[in-house]
Every structure is written in C-alpha cells, then in structure tokens.
C-alpha cells in the first residue's frame, strides 16, 4: 500500500481488506498483490468494517456514511448517521446493524432503505472537539461500546439472545436452542452452556412475515454443514435433548 496509513483489517470472501486514513478507498489483498477497490463517495478516509446480511460494509469520514461493497469500484451508499462526521465502531447485535460516531459519540441502528435511528448518545464530556463511540464488541448477549475521552465502557441489550463465546472444534456437534415462557437456553452436545436473563414472553411479539432462513443470518452464511434439523412446537426437556444429541449424522 506504499506510504498509506492502514486503519482496519478484515477477511471477507477469501480476501484481506484494509481501510486507510489516506484517501476514501478500500484495498484488498489476494495473497500476492493489493487491489484498489475504488474511490468511495467524496470522502477522504475509510474507517471500520463489518459484515451485514452477508455483505461487506465500510464506514467513512467526513460524511459519516456507510457503504456496501458490491464489487471492485462499485459501492452502494446505505445512509448517513445523524449529523455526524465519522462512523467508527460498527457491528451486528442480535440482528441489528449498529454504528458509533464522532463527534458526539452517538450509537445509531440501521432500519433499512438508507435510514438510521439514533439509539443513544454515550459521551457528554464538555469543552472538547470530538467525542467518540470508538469500538464495539459482543459478549454474553450484550453489546459493549468504548468511548473517548470519558474512558467509559457502555453495555446494552437489544431483545434477548443466548450465545456461547467459544469456537466449536471440528466434527459434528448437536446444538439445541430452547425458548420457554421466561428464558432462552443453549445446549451444545446435550450440555447447557448458556442461559438468558428472565423475561415475560407475553411482552414480546415474535410474529414475522420474513421467510425462515436456515444456515444464514444477519451476519452472513454459516461456515459448515447442517444435518438432522428439527423444529419443535414446545420446549424440550433435558432428557429429550440428550437423546437427540446421541444420534449423530452418519
């Protein structure tokens, strides 16, 4: 990349991608050479990456816009976050695409069709030029955001979810997700590995006109194989989960 300052790196669809403070461009590496993926809008800096609905997205300065990667030299503008100047940390939390900003350290959520909604401003430090919702991570069903200059870490939760923050080793594994009237649980090879906080199911409307998609999600496709998929109309008991777990694919 020559003298350009690299900001963020990510791997997507077999390539290594890089953003830069020098020019509103993204570069990708195929193992031998770097390719310029084109000028993005009228911006002068590219910042963060995230994958949403299986597609690579990048954030910008000074427009505070997010662009979706279509192909080399082709980017689609999916909207501006408020009246901000830069989008910093980005991630997908429980299906919602969110981004943190500068100079007011706001967090916005993507509603689709180029529209973003303000969730909350996180840093109110007085008498400074820039406040940043800088970087994000997800853990134990919550999203965390670090802010500057206040030096605080904020946590939030959108809906309810369970996760197991470990990588699965190679081979077949039985995964069971169970919803009761007050809790979600996750089971790996018949062992319960995660449990949500309590809730009242009557307060949640889970009706949806969206099609059921298997093996893919809001982040992207599942990297592996699926077999013996079952959907039950009731919560399974631990003994039932154990029995299903014992039946591995041939």
Task: State what each model feature region is.
Residues 18, 58, 202-204:
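Tandem-repeat/low-complexity and Cys-motif detector
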Residues 20, 60, 101, 147, ...:
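Glycine-rich, histidine-containing beta strand-loop boundary motifs that form or position
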Residues 1-5, 11, 15, 21-47, ...:
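Trp- and S/T/G-rich repeat-edge/linker motifs of beta-rich repeat architectures
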Residues 10, 50, 91, 115, ...:
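Extracellular glycan-associated modules
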């Amino acid at each position: 990349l020559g003298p350009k300052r690299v900001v963020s790196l990510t791997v997507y669809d077999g390539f290594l991608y890089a953003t830069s403070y020098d020019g509103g461009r993204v570069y990708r590496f195929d193992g031998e050479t770097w390719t310029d993926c084109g000028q993005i809008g009228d911006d002068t800096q590219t910042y963060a990456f995230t994958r949403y609905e299986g597609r690579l997205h990048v954030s910008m300065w000074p427009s505070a816009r997010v662009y979706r990667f279509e192909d080399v030299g082709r980017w689609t503008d999916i909207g501006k976050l408020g009246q901000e100047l830069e989008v910093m940390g980005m991630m997908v939390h429980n299906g919602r695409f969110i981004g943190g900003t500068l100079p007011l350290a706001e967090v916005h959520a993507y509603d689709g069709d180029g529209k973003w909604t303000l969730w909350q401003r996180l840093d109110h430090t007085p008498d400074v030029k820039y406040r940043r919702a800088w970087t994000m991570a997800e853990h134990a069903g919550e999203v965390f955001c670090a802010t500057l200059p206040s030096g605080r870490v904020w946590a939030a939760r959108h809906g309810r979810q369970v996760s197991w923050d470990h990588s699965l080793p190679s081979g077949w594994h039985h995964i069971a997700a169970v919803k009761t009237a007050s809790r979600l649980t996750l089971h790996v090879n018949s062992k319960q590995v995660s449990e949500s906080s309590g809730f009242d199911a009557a307060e949640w409307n889970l009706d949806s006109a969206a099609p059921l998609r298997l093996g893919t999600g809001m982040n992207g496709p599942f990297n592996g194989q699926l077999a013996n998929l079952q959907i039950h109309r009731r919560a399974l008991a631990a003994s039932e989960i154990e029995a299903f777990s014992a039946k591995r694919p041939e």
